[in-house]
Amino acid sequence: MRINPTTSGPGVSTLEKKNLGRIAQIIGPVLDVAFPPGKMPNIYNALVVKGRDTVGQQINVTCEVQQLLGNNRVRAVAMSATDGLMRGMEVIDTGAPLSVPVGGATLGRIFNVLGEPVDNLGPVDTRTTSPIHRSAPAFIQLDTKLSIFETGIKVVDLLAPYRRGGKIGLFGGAGVGKTVLIMELINNIAKAHGGVSVFGGVGERTREGNDLYMEMKESGVINEKNISESKVALVYGQMNEPPGARMRVGLTALTMAEYFRDVNEQDVLLFIDNIFRFVQAGSEVSALLGRMPSAVGYQPTLSTEMGTLQERITSTKEGSITSIQAVYVPADDLTDPAPATTFAHLDATTVLSRGLAAKGIYPAVDPLDSTSTMLQPRIVGEEHYETAQRVKQTLQRYKELQDIIAILGLDELSEEDRLTVARARKIERFLSQPFFVAEVFTGSPGKYVGLAETIRGFQLILSGELDGLPEQAFYLVGNIDEATAKAMNLEMESKLKK
């Protein structure tokens, strides 16, 4: 059953009339609370502890019920630090799961797991809230038609296209352009699809969250002058927070995204950075609750928890949530249960390559390692599929020849191989593209390239029509017409120098 968004969550005045319990035991972030007989809260209900510690400091801790222990006691996990809590303190049962603000007022703001703004810009101007625990859309509500989600980024749309309402895994180390790629996608969905984005920072560094916020303000993704014109809402539960907060922050971000999809009927991009930290937090909570660990120490409910989150990310007849999830692979072991469980849900993977970034080719998406289940003739059409396969074959052949070139040089290659290398180098450069959000740093205007234009450009390179053009003409341009214009300019410049 779908729960409709409720208006205005429980305020303090209404809280006082709810069930009251008392803390019976505290072990780190886990609280045992005793309630009067017949007044037990439900699983996932939010409990609030209000009071003062021994120094007189105000305490306000929200917890979530995880287990009913019997003898009128429940076990709950705290969403913030439990410092200063004492046995016997009063606990209020709110009578409902955690509810967070949703709607247009969330754009341009930063929230914590409880939906409280943490950016010092005052309260959120909305009375509409929604519970973070909801069932996935019923099968009858789903939009089962397979369609491509056009990003305007050539390398993605041609070689590893995203599915509308699909899940994409983003792999890449530090400093290869993950943040810039994420910001460009946020920018493009707003411009081309009239959509919005929600960014869920799950268990990552606070510094990275702050850097992302600053870069978004600098590039215009967050509009400081008119905050309502921003294109993204940010939800952070960083690695210094208790496991309960890190486990639920993904659901908070997803709930905000669902409102844009179901009520505003928009296309939404949901970023989760990092999905591994969601699993890790679940593992910590599972151990704290005394559950028997499963393989490699993970929680026994790993697949269920992952499925509950992922099944809510989908296309309905109203709109779509397309999710891009950064995946950390512990010790580069792809068989580790956390990444292995994630892979089962992914429709496409975008792999960022340090080698391409070192060459200055941005976006540094690896054209041979990135994959997509959408790249099939019956979905994308014969023309797109054939072009993509020929591009991959050319790049693969170039990769195979690189050792020979390094040892013997280009002159030792056959005529056919030399032609392949020349075209592959043009393709490699043509896969680069100037980004709108990088205009501030590069000075060159960003380009959105439609899928039809992308296919036409690569077909012209593969056909040999552009063999006479210098390869630098293909570097950091939009469509193929810009490359030919750039080649003419380069020719003019070289003539003037002579």
Curated annotation (Swiss-Prot):
Keyword ATP-binding: yes
InterPro entries with a match to the protein in the record: AAA+_ATPase, ATP-synt_VA_C, ATP_synth_F1_bsu, ATPase_a/bsu_AS, ATPase_alpha/beta_chains, ATPase_F1/V1/A1_a/bsu_N, ATPase_F1/V1/A1_a/bsu_N_sf, ATPase_F1/V1/A1_a/bsu_nucl-bd
Keyword Cytoplasm: no
Residues the record lists as binding ATP: G172, G173, A174, G175, V176, G177, K178, T179
Coiled-coil residue windows: none
Record localization: Plastid, Chloroplast thylakoid membrane
Membrane topology: Peripheral membrane protein
Record EC number: 7.1.2.2
Alphabetized SUPFAM superfamilies for the sequence: C-terminal domain of alpha and beta subunits of F1 ATP synthase, N-terminal domain of alpha and beta subunits of F1 ATP synthase, P-loop containing nucleoside triphosphate hydrolases
Cellular component aspect of the GO annotation: chloroplast thylakoid membrane; mitochondrion; proton-transporting ATP synthase complex
Gene Ontology MF terms: ATP binding; ATP hydrolysis activity; proton-transporting ATP synthase activity, rotational mechanism
Biological role: Produces ATP from ADP in the presence of a proton gradient across the membrane. The catalytic sites are hosted primarily by the beta subunits.
Family: Belongs to the ATPase alpha/beta chains family.
Subunit structure: F-type ATPases have 2 components, CF(1) - the catalytic core - and CF(0) - the membrane proton channel. CF(1) has five subunits: alpha(3), beta(3), gamma(1), delta(1), epsilon(1). CF(0) has four main subunits: a(1), b(1), b'(1) and c(9-12).
Name of the featured protein: ATP synthase subunit beta, chloroplastic
Organism classification: Eukaryota, Viridiplantae, Streptophyta, Embryophyta, Tracheophyta
